[in-house]
Amino acid sequence: MLTSALPASTTQPAAQRAAEVPAMTRTESAALATAEVTRFVALMEALGPEDWAKPTPCTAWSVRDILAHQAGAYAGGASLREFLHQNGRPPKAGELAEDVANRIQLADRAGRGPAELLAELKAVWPQAVARRKQLAPVVGLITLPRPDGPGLNLGHLFTVIYARDTWMHRLDISRATGRAMQLTPEHDGRMVALVLRDLAANLGPKLGDAAVRFELSGAAGGAWVVGGSAAPSATVQMETLDFNIYASGRFSYAEARAKATLSGDTALAERALRATAVLY
């Protein structure tokens, strides 16, 4: 747990308004996705035979299952036919659209071992990244309703969420196998800043005029203000990767609260932390 923040005039790092984090361009998106899947592949290549069956924070998914999901997701990005195969069926009651695609990705690859799955991922990801960059302006005209929050713009899905999904699964596997996650401010810091940008869109309206400062420690961290135009009256401090695990739904509120330090208006900080959720 981090120590409480000291007076802003002496020690607090400069904070950026999360809503003002620059949006992702298509060119940057392709570069970020390329760097991320390259890191993901390198992690897969470093795993040993004992790692593939290990459980992960993704319910019912092993390390091998996450690799199958990523191979399937990039195969869907590389081929329209495969994309429609994965996404053309309506979800069941209580499911989200991505639950259907995920289930199909794993079912189609049920008999494949890690080496075959990794070979598939390597073969399809360059085309997937290129096609998503090409199609983002067109699909950006479409926003799909979601039962769990604001609608999902498909341009945002193509330019931001797919790369974020790979990034988050790299974190899942790093934690599951006890490996340190490769982190740099330029790459992972940008990933995290975009998470805070989305958090501002989701959480900001719920805070009204109030504002909360999020201080995330580590190589990919930083400080951001979420909420109204007023000066922040509360601070939430967490380690960056723990914050993303929580924001993605992999920690309960109780688990996140135990890892966070709240200061200032702690009631406001608790309200903000409870409502912290972002699509990954």
What are these regions (language model features)?
Residues 205-245:
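Glycine/small-residue-rich hydrophobic helix-like segments
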Residues 20-68, 77-79:
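An N-terminal domain-cap segment
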Residues 231-280:
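C-terminal interaction segments
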Residues 29-36, 117-120, 124, 158-165, ...:
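Amphipathic alpha-helix face/heptad-repeat signature
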Residues 135-140, 180-183, 206:
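Short, structured loop/turn "capping" segments at alpha-beta junctions
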Residues 36-39, 43, 73, 124-127, ...:
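Amphipathic, well-ordered alpha-helical segments in soluble domains
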